[in-house]
Amino acid sequence: MITPTKEQSRIRETAGLSLLIVAPAGCGKTEAMALRLAGLIERGQVPWPRKVLVTTFSNRARDNIRERLQRHLPPAAFRDRVTVANFHGLAARIFRAHANVIGLDPQMIIPDSDWVGDQCRSRRLSFQRAHDVQETLRAVKQKPLDDAEVRAALAATGDRDAIAIEQQRIADHRLTYDDLPRVAELILQDKSVADLYSCLFACVLVDEFQDLTPQLLRMIRHIGYGKTTYAGDIAQAIYGFAGAAPTQILQEIQQETGSNVIVFAESHRSSPAVLERVNDLAPYTGGQRLRSADPGSWPGGGLSGLASFPGTAAEAEYVRAFADTVLEHAPGHRIGVIARTAARRRFADAAFEQSGLPWHRWDDPVLDTETAKIMKATLAGISPAVAGAEPDLLTFLRFACGLESVHDPATRQALNEAVGWACDLLREGLSPAQVRARIKMGDDSTLLTAPGVHLLTGHTGKGQQFDWVVIVGAEEGCIPDFRATAPGDLAEEARVLSVMISRARHGVLILRAEAVESQAGKLFSKQPSRFLAAFEGSAQSRDREGTRQWICDADWSRLGTAST
């Protein structure tokens, strides 16, 4: 059993049901939430047959906290006293049980895939157009509107594609992922239903409060106002594009919890050198300044390096050489190569494809054996000419892989998602053979535990950790993104960079190129990211020679045995 920290013990012993936990990356938030729940149950604050509701955003987070809870609770207590659900799962449960309250059929189709994305593909919308349509639907459906009001709001936008997709949804008698929280909120506006769930759940725990949309906060408050523990970190709020409103959400939570706040400041994940880079960005992110819980345990105090290159080829080669050196000394280590966007990372991707090193691209799904077998066979039978000429590529791929003949729900869902992924890549111009070559077999644990190089973006890396992180593309227009023009956008861009840095345990390298090729092959001069100024003059920031010397002097006998 892990010995709780002082802050974790305080959380366990806090009797009040309303609490705000500010827990930056690597400070033990998940363990603290498990201890919080165990303390509430042991003190009898969740009398049988009432339960604790624990909400998360993703299945991965749900499974992670479930595993932690099982360490602290007897099996019977966990089974009978705890409900762990992601927000869409909770919303689906509420809809199935009470759809009649808002005049809907509880047997409507519940989403198990990105149906709106599939509709955009079927209509052959461009990627930008599909993005705009999905944004229109999301924005409208994050308001407490019934179906008639949604139709009126969409009509007011004049977006014909969004209107047509909504009409198709209603005709198909289905809900989308955007609909689930909307209908759940409408149902919970009925006091009798809200009282039922408030009575069932003696208290609520919310993971990653900074990612809440106003809609999700309203939904939770119908069930647990005044008896909810919110855990998270404003410096990790990077989902504004999905409707999250971290500043507003934090203010409302503070009004609810009052002075009941516990703040973590000790990191157990990252070396002092990495934490210094995170702290440098605190004025931009609004985050808590962090210190290492055990600075002496990190060989050499960790590594933080900055480097610039004439172009992306030299940058990519430097990343490859660094990974080669690390894996030679510590073959069990994991190296995250992260960029703000996948497009900016493509130069590093190409270098690793030819490197002979073990690498994993997080943009691509890791398919189970059966799904991978079907997709490989399907793509092997499609010529580039056919793929380029097919007017409805998504429908063609579904037919070609025999999706309609697959009856197992799990296999069908996995195959449907794989078909959508392949369709997107083919529409981007990749050949069927190139898409086929990107198929990898395994499961989610492959990405979470496999040694080697991991290629990902800042958003997909949130919640993960690597022994080393190399950030490429630290240029204006990339980080911060050139589209970051609205109020608050720059703060969120700084938080994206901070999240990327804080994935690292032993060391982080932040790289930029002076010239970057566009997708069309045109070369553009690039200025360094404005955020790099925060790191200048720091004793912890090493240049290329300083980084080389640190690697040469490092105690790899200690580093090699201290992996994630």
Regions found by a protein language model. Give the residues of each.
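Accessory N-terminal region flanking or inserted into the helicase ATPase core
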Residues: 1-22, 31-32, 51-53, 123-205, ...
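Conserved P-loop NTPase-based nucleic-acid remodeling module centered on helicase motor cores
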Residues: 49-139
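A short beta-strand element within the Helicase C-terminal
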Residues: 454-482, 508
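C-terminal accessory regions
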Residues: 426-450, 475-564
